[in-house]
Amino acid sequence: VGQNRGAGKMDRVRQGVRCTQFMIWGYSIFAMVLVFFFGKYMTWLFISPSETAVVSAAVTYFRMVFWCYPFLGSIFLYRNTLQGLGYGLVPMLGGVFELIARAAIVYIVSGRASFAGVCLADPAAWISALIPLVPYYFYIMRKTNKAEEKIE
């Protein structure tokens, strides 16, 4: 990203982000299917099958969060793209949004909801982190487009 920006080839940055987003979706769908059908067996790699309560909790967690894997991948994409372009404040702000969302969900649902409710803290955090990242990425790209048009 940084090299392409330095070379003035922002079209490559756009193309890279677009291609990476497709790869994130492809990998996420694969991971969703894997976790949905084999999540219980995957936990057995780390937890004894005799620990049924722990395995059940892990499967519940998997089932609550797997649908948000594309959002998780997108956090890495947009955060690292913005950092590579030289913008550090907004990616850090995304982390703050993530932390606030995680804490808020746990505070709201703990004691009032089940374990499944607490599991929603991660998806809420991932989606919240994207709130400043995605719009800022498109703002930067639009601003760069206008600057490129003035040069031509």
Positions of the model-derived regions?
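Short alpha-helical transmembrane segments in multi-pass integral membrane proteins
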Residues: 1-68, 109-152
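Membrane-interface junctions at transmembrane-helix termini in multi-pass inner-membrane proteins
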Residues: 69-97
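A short pocket-lining beta-strand/turn micro-motif at the edge of beta-sheets
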Residues: 88-90, 103-105, 116
